[in-house]
């Protein structure tokens, strides 16, 4: 029987070697491709909070795999329960982590909990890969021939077990010959667009141009953006979406310029217990991310040492600004959302 120790995950950003979890350091990309050991709860939490491992689906998968590996290593049920609690608190906004850990907790309660946790973790990886493919197929059907699309942050294989969410849509649209090019927001303050999405699109052979976040409005006014595609970290019961900071700005601009604004996400990003965007916890991050820059390219500070900084990692886009929620189950329309599609009874 195949165990986690012998498994080839076939993901871009996670691997298991000799029963230990390794992550691709996404803070070092694109200058360096470095793998970091994440074999303890403390080390994985540190990597998550430092954004060395990031992306709502991938965070949940990394936590699930580590728990299963720790179970195989002989960690007691009581200690695994403590690990679950600690991992759950590592990043508050992305709901995939909470959903995955809830499933791992159910596996932990089984009589054969070691085997059950390994099976559940592998199931989560396989499911995420399949969900990405379904999202890509549904989304690509919305892309018209010759489209110039704009995307924000990073939503590809680096952030998932599969081809990604919004980037998966771009990939399939490109393969179908309908994509002219992608405008890539650099995504301040941590430059996930400039560092990760630009690198990923280049690896996939998808034509793109990198822009500063503040250039998006000008491009829309010139008619050079046909649609905007973003991912999501949490979808509330009323359809509001939490995503990387700057997403809301794009949605407002798209609404003004009458450009379709699509959210691509798996159903695991939906939180039926969260009534609306106001109830979504928004992570606040360090001032140093705004006063300067660091990563694989070195460190530079441009703001005064004592500059006051406001640095939320996410913002909330109201459902009224979204043209469609592209899930693994299909494209959800504003009319369906208004009728209660995301409400708990569903």
Curated annotation (Swiss-Prot):
The active site is at 233 (proton donor). GO terms for molecular function: S-methyl-5-thioribose-1-phosphate isomerase activity. One of its GO terms (biological process) is L-methionine salvage from methylthioadenosine. Pathway: Amino-acid biosynthesis; L-methionine biosynthesis via salvage pathway; L-methionine from S-methyl-5-thio-alpha-D-ribose 1-phosphate: step 1/6. Its EC number is 5.3.1.23. It catalyses: 5-(methylsulfanyl)-alpha-D-ribose 1-phosphate = 5-(methylsulfanyl)-D-ribulose 1-phosphate. Substrate binds at residues 54-56, 91, 192, 243-244. Gene3D superfamilies: translation initiation factor eif-2b, domain 1, Translation initiation factor eif-2b, domain 2. It is an enzyme of class 5 (isomerase). The record marks 153 as: Transition state stabilizer. Keywords: Amino-acid biosynthesis, Isomerase, Methionine biosynthesis. Belongs to the eIF-2B alpha/beta/delta subunits family. MtnA subfamily. NCBIfam families: eIF-2B_rel, PRK05720.1, salvage_mtnA. Catalyzes the interconversion of methylthioribose-1-phosphate (MTR-1-P) into methylthioribulose-1-phosphate (MTRu-1-P). This is Methylthioribose-1-phosphate isomerase. It comes from Yersinia pestis (strain Pestoides F). The lineage of its organism: Bacteria, Pseudomonadati, Pseudomonadota, Gammaproteobacteria, Enterobacterales. The gene is mtnA.
């Amino acid at each position: 029987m195949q165990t986690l120790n012998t498994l080839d995950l076939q993901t871009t950003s996670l691997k298991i070697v000799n029963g230990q979890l390794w992550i691709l350091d996404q803070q070092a990309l694109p200058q360096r491709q470095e793998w970091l050991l994440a074999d303890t709860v403390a080390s994985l939490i540190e990597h998550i909070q430092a954004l060395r491992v990031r992306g709502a689906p991938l965070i949940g998968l990394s936590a699930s795999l580590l728990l299963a590996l720790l179970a195989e290593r002989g960690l007691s049920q009581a200690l695994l329960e403590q690990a679950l609690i600690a991992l759950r608190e590592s990043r508050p906004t992305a709901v995939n982590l909470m959903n995955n850990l809830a499933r791992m907790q159910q596996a932990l309660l089984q009589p054969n909990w070691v085997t059950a946790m390994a099976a559940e973790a592998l199931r989560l990886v396989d499911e995420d890969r399949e969900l990405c493919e379904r999202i890509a197929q549904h989304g690509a059907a919305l892309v018209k021939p010759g489209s110039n699309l704009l995307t924000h942050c990073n939503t590809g294989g680096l952030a998932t077990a599969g081809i990604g969410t919004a980037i998966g849509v771009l990939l399939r649209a490109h393969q179908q010959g309908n994509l002219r090019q992608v405008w890539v927001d650099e995504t301040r303050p941590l430059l996930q667009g400039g560092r990760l999405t630009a690198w990923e699109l280049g690896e996939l052979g998808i034509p793109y141009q990198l822009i500063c976040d503040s250039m998006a409005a000008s491009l829309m006014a010139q008619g050079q953006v046909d649609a905007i595609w973003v991912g999501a970290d949490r979808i509330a019961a009323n359809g509001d979406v939490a995503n990387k900071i700057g997403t809301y700005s794009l949605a407002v601009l798209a609404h003004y310029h009458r450009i379709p604004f699509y959210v691509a996400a798996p159903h695991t990003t939906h939180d039926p217990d969260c009534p609306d965007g106001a109830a979504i916890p928004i992570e606040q991050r360090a001032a140093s991310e705004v006063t300067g820059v660091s990563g694989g390219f070195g460190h530079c500070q441009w703001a005064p040492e004592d500059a006051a900084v406001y640095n939320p990692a996410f913002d909330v886009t109201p459902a009224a600004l979204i043209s469609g929620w592209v899930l693994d189950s299909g494209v959800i329309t504003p009319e369906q959302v208004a009728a209660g599609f995301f409400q708990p009874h569903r």
